[in-house]
Amino acid sequence: NMDHYMELDYFKANSTIALYSLYSDEPTYYVPFAAVDASVAKEHDSYFFLRRFSVFEPWVLSDDERENTLTPEEIATVDESIAEIRARSMYAVPEIEVDSTDRILALVTCSYELPDARFTLFCRALREGETPESVAAIVQNATAMN
């Protein structure tokens, strides 16, 4: 239940997400780096333009394509988006680094905390050398932002 990620203790205790695919026998593991609860209605103060990420091409490229084809402008756009996501997050997890070369997963569900709201859990794929256990130890340092 994604709503549980709105609680810091649950966020810390469930620090990796396994994504199973038809294309691999092994799951891809992701670590959450931000949790955003915001309205998707422009007239609300907490408005967050979530739909821009649904067609954000650099995040749907393969790892090799992303590393070899992003222009400096695209890299800057990705980095700005990551910075905005982190600034809007309910939690701070600064030790989990995220940049334009990472594969990002956004899990979205309806939220009833705000009008027309969506709760979004932003995660990045584990990097080479990381394990679910190693990032779990880092996520334990997460703190509430507000």
Task: Report residues per predicted region.
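Extracytoplasmic/periplasmic soluble domains downstream of a signal peptide or transmembrane helix
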Residues: 1-146
